[in-house]
Each structure stands twice: as C-alpha cells, then as structure tokens.
Amino acid sequence: MISINLIKLTSITNGILYCSNYATLHSISIHSITTDTRKITPKCLFIALIGKNFDAHMFVNEAISKGAAALLLEKQCYPKNVIPQIIVQNTTIALGKIASWIRDQTNATVIAITGSSGKTSVKEMTSSILKNCGNTISTFQNLNNNIGVPLTLLNLNKSHKYAILELGANYPKDIEYTTKITKPNIALINNIYHSHLAGFKSLFGVAQAKQEIFLGLRKNGIAIYNKDSNYWSKWKKNLLTQKIINFSIKKNSTIFASNITTSNQGSKFKIHSPNGEIYVTLPLLGYHNISNALAAATIAISINIPLEIIKIGLSSLPILKNRLQIIRLNKYKTIINDTYNANTASMIVAIKILENISGYKLFVAGDMLELGKNDVLYHKIIGNTIYNSNINEVFSIGKLSKEISIASKKGHHFYNSDELLKNLKNKLLNKKIITILVKASRSEKLDVIVEQLIKEYHKA
C-alpha cells in the first residue's frame, strides 16, 4: 500500500479529524488499512464498516488494544485523546474514496473484468499470463463487490505493473460504483447469462448492469467484449472509446479459436489474432474455458504481450478449486467438483462435459439461486437437458433441484446430506467405471459433501 498521513486521509474522505495532538498529525503515517481486527498491524488504520447485519464499531476497543494507529468511523467511540479518529458520514463510501485515490497514485495498467460467469477464471488466467511480464496484483478469491474491490485496490503500490480486478453485481448500479473507483485502462465483459435475476429481473437487465463497467473506463481505454454473448451490439453503441476489441470461439471476431480438440485432461486450440497465431494447451475442462482463455488472451494481446508469453501463462494455470476440479480416486473412478457457482448456462456446460466422458455418468445437482420468479422453470429446463443427454443418473438435493430430478426422468431426490452421501458412496463402490459431477451454487455447500465423499471412499 502507498502510505498516507492522517491529514490527507481526512481530506480524501471529507471527514472530521479528532486528535489530542494536532501538531504531530503530519508525522503519523498510515501504512496499511483493514476492516478486520484480526489483521491489525502497526501503523494501521481500522475502518469500522456497517452492514445489514453487523456494525464493526463494536470492535473498536479490540482495534485499539491490538495497536491500530487511527480509526475511521461513522460515530466517535472514544474521547479524542485515546486515538486519532476520522469521522465520516459513511465508512463504506470512505473506503471507496481512499481506494480510488490510491489507484490514481500508480501507473499500473488496471484491468476490470465482469460477466455472468467465468470472471474468476478469466482473472486467474490473465494473472497467470501477466505475472510473467511484471509485478501483478489481482482480486483475492472472488471479493468483487463494493467492499472487496476497494480492499484489493488498497494493496496497490508503485511497484505494480498490472492490477486485475473482478467486478460483480447483484443489482443495477453495483458495477457503476466499483468501475468508477477502479478507473480501468481495460474493461472486459466476458458474457451475459441468466444470473442474479432476483436483482436484475431479466436477461436484458443483466446486460444493462454489466455494461456499466464501461462507465469507468479511462479516456483512450480499451473495451473488450465476447461476440458470442447476448446484447453485445447494445454495448458497442454505448461505448465512448474507439479502442474496441471482440473475441469469439467462432471465426467472426478480432480474436478467435480454431482447431479445437478436447479430452478429460483439458483442451488444445489455436488462437488467431492480429499479432499472429499460436497453439495453446489449456489444462481445464470445457468449451467455456476455451472462451475464458480467449478473453484472457485478448486482454494480453491488447497491451502487446507476446503470444509465447500468453501460451506459457495459459498452459501453466494452477488448479481452480471447486471449478470443474478433477479429483481422480483411481484409474476408473473420478469426481468433478464444480460447486463454486451455478446458473443455467454453467449447468448446461457441466452437463455437456459429463456427456463426453466414458463410463457411468452421475450428475449431482443442488439449487441454482437468485434466478427470480422463474426459478422453478429454469430448474425444469436443466432436468429436460439431462433427459436428452446420455447421462445415466441424477441425484439432487435442495428445495428447487427436485425439479431437475423429476424433469430428467432418471433422478433421485434427497432431503438431507447424509442420505445423499450414503448413496454416492454406494455408487462409487459398486460401479467399475464412474464419473460423478457435483454442481450447485456455492451457498448450497455441496463442496463439503465432495470432501466427505472422498474421505468415505478412502475409508472403505
């Protein structure tokens, strides 16, 4: 982080500073900022955030006892002679203002990524490429909201060459807020699918929300979009920049893929670009990951990263936990853990992947959440898709996923995880060659069932 003194912090946040000795203020320099008292370090500013179900002002005493140098609060909690305090109207907004100021102090190329799915994968792929070219920072895990994005920006310093940020949204204006803090040099929309419909109401609502990312794009910035996705023509109309690049799995775009071959180890394909062509090996399953790789490659190509570096970055990707993560129990028995997230598009992708694997195929489905008033219909659509596939059997758990089992006509619904686990274990033990793919929204916690299943299998 770039250090800031308290006078400057007060100015940035439009706050009121309370301190027992104003003469020493210029000598008090903040070297780190946290919203978590477990991460208090010397010369640290503690920001007390307030949410729907919490108020971090209750942890101010702990922050002081652990050695925080100053506090940023919405209400003065202690006499000013205890510790310097900056009082603001809204600590979450103040956090964003500080992050925006820090972003402006660096010359890093800032890349912002959004989309209905694949944001984290594209972020990780882009990071894997760019870290070979300079000091790179990226969003930790999927902390992509109005708090997570500023917290990532706080870690920027003048040594960073690249910053890769994931921008998520549940409602309109969410991305407009984070992109205006981020002020990206490059902004990318990966795709538009039916997701978070409780907040966006329709696919068009999703598209409108995602295109907000371009509102923060810097002058002469680069806009990138997936030509295979919905509503891309509307994004293009609203762009102010002239630097627009598209990518596609098909041959109708600036950057595209050809000669695609897939296996249960990943895929191989050729990337075509204005800078040349190159074959790439990707150690991830699914056509959607080829599209994600093209997104990352397009970002890199837009800033003239050599194709060989792109090839190295994509081929050396780390395993992405809970995202089509392959777990081989032995030569014949495999679990594919895809419990990171779920919407209709990613469910269909998972079904297609399982279809192309030999042996007995068992699809385990949990609920897809935040799909709005048509959520039952979307679960039935997934069930119908499985019915028309070569998948042998479906296990489901959750309030909505029962519709998947019913519509598939080859499903069994379970009302508790113990019964599901017991039946999964029996399938693993009794089928000679079997692949079990587990898919659900993250909050359904089917990743826990995957971990338990692995343990139970090895005990048997």
UniProtKB/Swiss-Prot annotation:
Subcellular location: Cytoplasm
Keyword line: ATP-binding, Cell cycle, Cell division, Cell shape, Cell wall biogenesis/degradation, Cytoplasm, Ligase, Nucleotide-binding, Peptidoglycan synthesis
Catalytic activity reported: D-alanyl-D-alanine + UDP-N-acetyl-alpha-D-muramoyl-L-alanyl-gamma-D-glutamyl-meso-2,6-diaminopimelate + ATP = UDP-N-acetyl-alpha-D-muramoyl-L-alanyl-gamma-D-glutamyl-meso-2,6-diaminopimeloyl-D-alanyl-D-alanine + ADP + phosphate + H(+)
Matches recorded under SUPFAM superfamilies: MurD-like peptide ligases, catalytic domain, MurD-like peptide ligases, peptide-binding domain, MurE/MurF N-terminal domain
Gene3D superfamilies: Mur ligase, C-terminal domain, Mur-like, catalytic domain, MurE/MurF, N-terminal domain
Enzyme superclass (EC): ligase
Binding-site residues, ATP: G115, S116, S117, G118, K119, T120, S121
Protein EC: 6.3.2.10
Pathway the protein contributes to: Cell wall biogenesis; peptidoglycan biosynthesis
Summary of the function given for this chain in its UniProt record: Involved in cell wall formation. Catalyzes the final step in the synthesis of UDP-N-acetylmuramoyl-pentapeptide, the precursor of murein.
Entry's family note: Belongs to the MurCDEF family. MurF subfamily.
NCBIfam families, per the entry: murF
Name this polypeptide is given: UDP-N-acetylmuramoyl-tripeptide--D-alanyl-D-alanine ligase
Organism annotation: Buchnera aphidicola subsp. Baizongia pistaciae (strain Bp)
